[in-house]
């Protein structure tokens, strides 16, 4: 919060040798690189990432939907270098480890609201507290809406609009020498597909090579304004649900932790390039 970070991409800008960028062709999908190792083809589901993402002990096999709001996170760790001993495969470059807040013994709550340009309307809230002497509960809700950063000169409207809703309930049971926490998450992200534009490369060799293929030239500055010229906005429909169960048992002067998890994800997107 002190950094005013909103997504993992913001965290990456303050971390040496780390790029936690968003994938260009699939919104809200990570294209993470640590120490030069990563995967640039995350629009293809079969591409294995070299930088793993772990939330509450659950590894993400596919890093769709990881570039979302950081609200309700207790901690974020960026581990550089191979992490196979701890997390198995797909972590040769490193890992991004996140932990959400746990249900508290004390009743408390927090609300965060943001209004910004381009129709940004964000509201997030979390409430936590005891349900009984041995049971604590928590529920967090994240809602984000925006009209889109780009203006489509062909369709005459904004492009890049998205609507995000994430609901994350959790419950903790405490007993003599053990505790068990179940964390569920349901999320839906709907909006436009990727925003693309053609532009004239300011390099003679590249220009001639591109033009030789029959591609039409657009003699414009790609960084001058936030416009796009595609014939359609495209579409994004991304949803997932997950469940993590963490069991901690005091055993012989230490703690034995067991984590079981499942995540089901459905993603459908298309765009005009």
Model-derived features with residue positions:
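Short loop/turn motifs enriched for small/polar and acidic residues
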Residues: 35-37, 144, 183-187
């Amino acid at each position: 919060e002190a950094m005013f970070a909103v997504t993992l991409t913001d965290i990456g800008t303050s971390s040496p040798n780390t790029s936690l960028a968003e994938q260009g062709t699939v919104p809200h999908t990570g294209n993470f690189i640590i120490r030069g190792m990563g995967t640039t083809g995350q629009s293809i589901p079969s591409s294995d990432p070299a930088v793993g993402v772990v939330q509450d002990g659950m590894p993400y096999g596919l890093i769709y939907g990881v570039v979302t709001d950081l609200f309700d996170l207790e901690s974020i760790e960026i581990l550089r270098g191979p992490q196979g001993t701890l997390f198995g495969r797909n972590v040769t470059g490193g890992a991004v480890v996140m932990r959400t807040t746990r249900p508290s013994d004390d009743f408390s709550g927090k609300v965060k609201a943001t209004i910004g340009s381009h129709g940004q309307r964000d509201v997030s809230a979390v409430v936590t507290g005891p349900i009984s002497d041995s049971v604590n509960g928590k529920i967090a809700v994240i809602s984000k809406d925006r009209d889109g950063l780009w203006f489509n000169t062909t369709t005459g409207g904004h492009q890049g609009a998205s609507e995000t809703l994430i609901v994350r309930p959790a419950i903790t049971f405490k007993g003599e020498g053990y505790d068990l926490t179940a964390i569920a998450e349901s999320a839906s992200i709907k909006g436009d597909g990727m925003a693309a534009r053609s532009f004239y490369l300011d390099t003679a060799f590249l220009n001639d090579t591109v033009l030789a293929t029959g591609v039409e030239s657009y003699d414009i500055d790609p960084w001058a304004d936030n416009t796009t010229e595609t014939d359609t906005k495209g579409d994004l429909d991304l949803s997932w649900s997950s469940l993590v169960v963490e069991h901690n048992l005091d055993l012989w002067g230490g703690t034995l932790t067991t984590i079981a998890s499942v995540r089901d994800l459905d993603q459908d997107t298309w765009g005009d390039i």
